[in-house]
A protein has these predicted regions:
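The feature captures the conserved acid-bearing segment of alpha/beta-hydrolase catalytic domains
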Residues: 12-18, 207, 213-364
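Residue in the alpha/beta-hydrolase core beta-strand immediately N-terminal to the catalytic nucleophile
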Residues: 179-181, 207-209
């Protein structure tokens, strides 16, 4: 049960340009708050003078902020960023440091704060979290081979419905839901992914941003895409080629491992995809209060998932599994990026990638 029965007022930063064209909603992780997460993220300097991100196994990763399930404690580490050719480099023509807010001058940034709840994993200690859950060492939403029996469901429902109210208000202010970006770190990423999958407004979201997160209920939704005999359903794109050990590697590195990679996916299997999403909606008992027909399959929504290879709280395997599965549910094209030397945190390079992604999906010119 929540200790607080309401969501605190979000922390809002108006556009640096004074002109509101887009809104970016970003959720903190468990134990954090908007007051700690928002300013730290917006005050982090992005790489400069033609530099861009690198995902090399042995590459340094610049200034980092640890802001996940850590009560908002931050740590910094300085190193020179690496250079990557390709689309990611287009943002960085400036010669002095800029921030995410300056890179997206027409964006209004909204940082919600989760209510205080009792956390099962912390012996029911009171902490801010978007939903309750078991320790992430367990997989497939199971504990001791048992389904989690809805432990995370109640608060996750409240969070998703709250996010829908925020999205609707920001869409009203900016004039179009497609100008709203939703995302977060850790638990905030989870809530954003679920909310984006179940959103049934007349217009789709502009995009989804995830850091250090994962998609819950994958095994249950995959069961809706694959027949009971384990073979490919006739109306789904998920089949033997995507089964474990089939020899297909959706994360196979290209000749330039530093740069973006769009993952395969699709929503050709409309019946099964709809079944998977309706299972998730039914599990969370979220009513279709938004306008739009449940008989019409959602359109694609672009997304980016960023994850540190040294994350000791959310294993990168959970993120890569999520990145493999999400395009089949309509989050595509999806960019999945790994960062050597980065833990359960965001870094300047992660924020650089996010800035480029948002510029791409919103059609904003680089500065």
């Amino acid at each position: 049960m929540p200790v607080e029965d309401h969501f605190p007022e979000p922390l809002v930063f108006n556009p640096a340009s004074g002109i509101h064209k887009h809104t970016v909603i970003l959720l903190h992780g468990r134990g954090g708050s908007a007051d700690a997460f928002g300013p730290a993220l917006l005050n982090t300097a992005l790489p400069v003078a033609g530099t861009a991100i690198s995902t090399q196994q042995d590459g340094p990763h610049g200034r980092r902020r640890t802001l996940g399930e850590d009560n908002g404690v931050s740590t910094d580490a300085s190193a020179a960023p690496s250079v990557c050719d390709g689309a990611s480099a287009k943002l960085y023509n400036h010669i002095s440091p800029i921030t995410l807010a300056q890179a997206l001058p027409h964006a209004r940034f909204v940082f919600p704060t989760a209510p205080k709840q009792r956390a099962t994993v912390y012996k029911r200690s009171i902490i801010r979290q978007w939903f309750d859950d078991w320790h992430l060492g367990f997989v497939d939403d199971k504990v001791d081979s048992r389904y989690d029996l809805g432990l995370q469901t109640t608060e996750l429902v409240s969070t998703v419905e709250y996010l829908y109210r925020l999205i609707a208000e920001e869409a009203r202010l900016v004039g179009d839901t497609r100008k709203v970006i939703l995302g977060g770190i850790s638990q905030g990423c989870v809530a954003s992914l679920v909310a984006s999958l179940l959103w049934k407004g007349e217009e789709e979201l502009g995009g989804v941003v995830g850091m250090c997160g994962w998609l819950p209920y994958i095994s249950q939704m995959r069961a809706q895409l694959v027949g009971r005999d384990g073979q490919e359903s006739r109306d789904t794109t998920w089949g033997e080629d995507l089964e474990e050990g089939a020899g297909f590697d959706p994360f196979e590195r290209s000749a330039s491992p530093d740069c973006d990679m769009d993952l395969p996916g699709g929503i050709d299997g409309k019946g099964s995809v709809k079944s998977a999403l309706e299972w998730l909606r039914g599990e969370l008992d979220i009513l279709e209060t938004q306008s739009g027909s449940s008989d019409v399959l959602r359109s694609s929504v672009p997304a980016i998932l960023c994850h540190g290879q040294d994350d000791d709280k959310v294993d990168i395997a959970k993120a890569s599994e999520s990145a493999e599965f999400l395009p089949a549910l309509g989050l595509e094209p999806l960019r999945f990026k790994e960062y050597a030397g980065v833990g359960h945190e965001f870094s300047s390079e992660i924020l650089s990638d996010i800035a480029v992604f948002i510029q791409d999906v919103l059609g904003e010119p680089s500065i």
